């Protein structure tokens, strides 16, 4: 099982309520959901609720999510030219599944004005994540590449309808690699070019327009051959070549239909 680390900024804490014109921020809620079979989206579950230490709510404080420096003081982390102040780790989640996450902020409300607490929409900053193994860096490719699910028994639970909505994953890949798939007779079935920035654009079962975040060391395959045919049942062999070092590793997987 893998984990997803969610980072976010503290801008909501200085937001002025449009009605009261006061900075009445109270806390954050983190939600998660997993894509189920045939493109259904499960209900969002509340993973964490955390709020200021005052006379409202649970008074948890932010110490469990705040990014701190070596001296224990509040700090930030720079990721892709953006500074983030908080993080939350969702552990023990299954690799290869599409997960949805959202961070919302909510205010204190105003009992005197008969106003309930307001919360930002879970859809305003929703992100799409495929947990998995990070890419092996140059000259640091440890272990063997593998395939999951293996064996592939007709359909994985994350598959949609139709032969082009099936999907399995190659795992433990270098940051730049070429995957070659062969039949047991030695016939070349498909060639896949992998880069660490892979976003699933070559797979019908992955909506790349939603900019899904991936670990970098995994690549999906739709079980369609290079001749645009569905693969048959059988044992398949594959090689993975590290494009930087030239190192080649081998593996095999079974398709049962």
What are these regions (language model features)?
Residues 22-24, 29-92, 146-149, 157, ...:
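Exoplasmic/lumenal beta-rich domain surfaces
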Residues 227-229, 233-257:
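C-terminal tail/sorting-segment detector
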Residues 104-108, 224, 239-243:
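Beta-strand-rich extracellular modules
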Residues 90-112:
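Beta-strand-rich modules
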Residues 2-22, 170:
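Conserved aromatic anchor
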Residues 108-139, 248:
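Extracellular fibronectin type III
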Residues 27, 98-102, 167, 232-237:
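Short, conserved beta-strand segments of beta-strand-rich sandwich/propeller modules, principally
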